Amino acid sequence: MIRSLATALSFGTVIPVPASVAAPMGRGAMTALPVVGVVLGGLAAGVTWSASLVFGPVSPLPGLLAVAVLLLATRGLHIDAVADTADGLGCYGPPQRALAVMRDGSTGPFGVAAVVLVIAVQGSAFSTLSAAGSRGIAGIAVAVFAGRVTAVLGCRRSVPAAAGSSLGSRVAGTQPISVLVAWLAVLLFASLAAAPRPWQGPAAVVAAVCAGTLLIRHCVRRFGGITGDVLGCAIELATTVTAVVLAALVRL
């Protein structure tokens, strides 16, 4: 378990992990990925809270700074996946052509638009949550955590890997139902602290998980399976949906 967690931290963050401890990304590391979400969620919540003390609760800067720190802490891994997946979904042709577009180093108009939207919406939602007090700050951490749980769900036993995907072939179909149920239960429990009313947090994370699952299902149909980019895009989508829904609900 320690080796799997070290691998997940090495893959999903800039935290230095000795090569002798980490291993190639696989089933165990994917199971441990939500723990990385806890670390990054705490970081994002801390940055947003600290920045709100400096710039005030109504400024958009706290949330945008938190998103910037997350991009640095993850080496931009998932936001790059958003761009690649958007370009792949936006092109015409068979799955092989779409996958080739995703592997291309350049970013097209769909990718640029998707990245701008994710950063702007996610940052704005984080800022709105920071103005809602301690519950809102907790909601930021829960949103980041929800993204990683969604990635685990995307690797459930029935999901195949896309042809030629290195990461997809190592993690697709590796997660048993027991792991999925366990992480979903933890996420739902954690979400109770993310909003004033007990139903609001669970409603937000359920909406996010459903959105991420629908994206993954569509990508399986379009690409023939999942890739690392698809999982990264699902992480960002679920994080953003959780934050947006919570930002709307905390005002009720």
From Swiss-Prot:
Superkingdom: Bacteria
GO molecular function terms noted in the UniProt entry: adenosylcobinamide-GDP ribazoletransferase activity; cobalamin 5'-phosphate synthase activity
Reaction equation(s) it catalyzes: alpha-ribazole + adenosylcob(III)inamide-GDP = adenosylcob(III)alamin + GMP + H(+); alpha-ribazole 5'-phosphate + adenosylcob(III)inamide-GDP = adenosylcob(III)alamin 5'-phosphate + GMP + H(+)
Main localisation: membrane
Entry's Gene Ontology cellular component terms: plasma membrane
Associated pathway: Cofactor biosynthesis; adenosylcobalamin biosynthesis; adenosylcobalamin from cob(II)yrinate a,c-diamide: step 7/7
Listed Pfam families: CobS (PF02654)
Cofactor(s) this protein cannot do without: Mg(2+)
Key words, A-Z: Cell membrane, Cobalamin biosynthesis, Magnesium, Membrane, Transferase, Transmembrane, Transmembrane helix
Cited function: Joins adenosylcobinamide-GDP and alpha-ribazole to generate adenosylcobalamin (Ado-cobalamin). Also synthesizes adenosylcobalamin 5'-phosphate from adenosylcobinamide-GDP and alpha-ribazole 5'-phosphate.
PANTHER family listed in its UniProt record: ADENOSYLCOBINAMIDE-GDP RIBAZOLETRANSFERASE
Family named by the database record: Belongs to the CobS family.
Name the UniProt record assigns to this protein: Adenosylcobinamide-GDP ribazoletransferase
Organism: Mycobacterium marinum (strain ATCC BAA-535 / M)
